[in-house]
A protein has these predicted regions:
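N-terminal anchoring/stem segment of glycosyltransferases
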Residues: 1-52, 276-349, 362, 467-471, ...
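Glycine-rich, basic loop-to-helix element that forms the pyrophosphate-binding segment
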Residues: 65-85, 345-356
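Conserved donor NDP-sugar-binding/catalytic core segment of glycosyltransferases
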Residues: 104-159, 386-392
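A recurrent flexible, glycine/aromatic-enriched loop bordering the glycosyltransferase active site
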Residues: 159-198, 430-447
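Active-site donor/metal-binding and catalytic loop motifs
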Residues: 212, 234-253, 490-508
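Acidic donor-binding/catalytic loop of UDP-sugar-dependent glycosyltransferases
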Residues: 45, 99-112, 373-384
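Short beta-strand-to-loop acidic/aromatic patch adjacent to the donor-nucleotide binding site
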Residues: 88-100, 365-372
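A short, conserved alpha-helix in the catalytic core of glycosyltransferases
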Residues: 187-196, 200-205, 211-238, 465-483
Length: 510
């Protein structure tokens, strides 16, 4: 049986070679691994060493990426390649390059599918010996029970030998109820060594690239498997030695890694909490950060067709109950902006404004409204501005025609520092950005937020806000001009008479 194993790498060729040598050492003629090697922009030296070894020792396909696109995207590229090239294969796997496998690791994974006559089991993963603590992970030790505690000297080989001789069940199975009960505390089956039925990717899609470089992506995909009525298993006698975080440590310090982990976990919990129960297709949302804005009661509410979500890091707001808003605590959410940044709280709100795709997976359309915007009309009608040909509708500014005029107005009204305004003005001039581009008023955004093009444009817009100015209207038109984005501009006069009104100026003042 030929089994494709997706292996993403970035530098760390010594670890990759150690992993590949262990696979070679424990080859089983009945389970032939084919390595789908996806290199994430490593140096030529690193790639050549791995290529040389693979050519002489293992069956493989190689995919070279020009730059590091992150673990998740690299895995998805490998999965799609393998599924297209080898469409008849029943199983496919993912492995990390910082693992060592052990005797029968692959056989023991596949064996856990054999009693599943209804194809309900879609994913089986290995136990993890964590070389950083010279022990099994606490979660995996609990799965095995007391017998494993009799090991006198903690090392990988002794654990493998001990567990191989245990008279115990082949696997432990997990389902949807496990995730519902523990609120995503556990991944259950991490993806450092895992086998899937290939059919699962046609059924529920691929790994969620909204988790960027990695962490919580495996928890999210496992949840999706179980949410769709399938189960996952952990193979008790398939054991790998895992270093963990090896690629991340090349890129970031420990504090940054911790922040990425915590943010992704928080994102996962919020996303699933918001999406698992609602049957509605549309959401209206906002974010109140610090004292920049305040939440208002809307004049026109339609709870039949919309959910209403307010993200906030404000302790005062978290204590309130304001109809129809469901208030979501995001105090601990990390947006990769330093707390010392004087614009932190404004940029915090901007993050949620530009990233609905991270939280509203099951909603088809979203309407963002700034905290000072009131709804006065029927927003079910407003949704019709989106059609098959556009993914974003936004008001056109009623007074100014272009970004350069907006820069001047921001300076006159004191809405941004002169230094930042000068920097973005010079940047736009150097980019040859044209003057007549119909400046937008971004207090209201209507989007098909899960559209791939929309996600791309929102990410680019966020980069501009992070690097230049908190005033998002100073960068929207540039981003859509630069990257060929398309949007529908709606006259603000039309919207303000029919759907929206402004209750107060930003900052919470009348």
């Amino acid at each position: 049986m030929k089994i494709n194993l997706i292996l993403p790498t970035y530098e760390n060729e010594d670890l990759t070679l150690k992993c590949l040598r262990s696979i070679k050492k424990y080859l089983d003629k009945n389970y032939e691994p084919n390595i789908i090697w996806v290199d994430n922009g490593s140096s030529e030296k690193s790639k050549n060493q791995i290529l040389k070894y693979l050519k002489s020792n293992l069956s493989f396909d190689n995919i070279y990426l020009e730059c590091n696109v992150g673990f998740i995207k690299a895995v998805n590229i490998g999965l799609k390649f393998a599924l297209e090239k080898y469409p008849k294969n029943k199983f496919i796997g993912i492995i990390n390059n910082d693992i060592e496998v052990s005797n029968d690791w692959l056989k023991n994974l596949i064996d856990c599918f054999k009693d599943d006559v209804d194809d309900k089991v879609q994913c089986v993963g290995s136990l993890c010996y964590d070389s950083n603590i010279n022990d099994l992970t606490q979660f995996d030790k609990r799965l095995i029970g007391d017998e494993i505690n009799n090991i006198s000297e903690h090392n990988f080989i002794e654990y493998v030998n001990k567990i191989s001789n245990l008279n115990c069940q082949k696997y432990v199975e997990f389902n949807y109820s496990n995730f519902k009960k523990d609120n995503f505390t556990y991944t259950y089956v991490p993806y450092y060594s895992v086998i899937f039925r290939t059919s699962i990717f046609q059924k529920i899609g691929f790994l969620n690239e909204n988790y960027n470089l990695g962490y919580a992506d495996d928890t999210e995909f496992n949840y999706r498997i179980c949410e769709n009525g399938f189960t996952i298993r952990k193979a008790i006698k398939s054991i790998v030695n895992h270093i963990g975080k090896s690629t991340f440590k090349l890129l970031y310090d420990e504090n940054k890694i911790f922040n990425i982990q915590e943010s992704n976990r928080k994102q996962l919990r919020i996303s699933k909490m918001l999406n698992q129960d609602s049957l509605k297709k549309n959401v209206i949302y906002t974010c109140i950060s610090g004292n920049y804005d305040r939440l208002i009661e809307l004049s026109n509410v339609d709870t039949k067709n919309f959910d209403y979500i307010c993200f906030t890091n404000s302790d005062l707001l978290l204590e309130k109950n304001i109809f129809p808003w469901k208030i979501i605590n995001v105090k601990d959410f990390n947006i990769d902006i330093d707390l010392s940044d004087t614009d932190y709280y404004v940029k915090f709100a901007r993050f949620f404004k530009l990233h609905p795709h991270l939280f509203f997976e099951k909603y088809e359309k979203s309407i963002w409204i700034d905290g000072n915007i009131n709804v006065i009309g029927n927003l079910s009608e407003y949704l019709n501005f989106l059609n098959d040909f556009n993914y974003l509708a936004i008001p056109i500014h009623p007074f100014r025609n272009n970004i350069y005029e907006e820069i001047f107005a921001c300076n006159r009204l004191g809405k941004e520092t002169n230094e930042k305004l000068n920097i973005i003005n010079k940047f736009l001039i150097n980019e040859n950005f044209p003057r007549n581009t119909n400046l937008v008023q971004s207090g209201v955004l209507l989007r098909k937020h899960n559209n791939d093009k929309c996600i791309f444009m929102m990410n680019k817009w966020w980069e501009m806000i992070k690097n230049y100015s908190k005033r998002d209207q100073l960068s929207f038109n540039y981003v859509f001009w630069k990257y060929g984005g398309k949007y529908l501009g709606i006259p603000w006069d039309l919207l303000s008479k029919t759907y929206f009104t402004t209750n107060y100026r930003h900052g919470g003042t009348k």
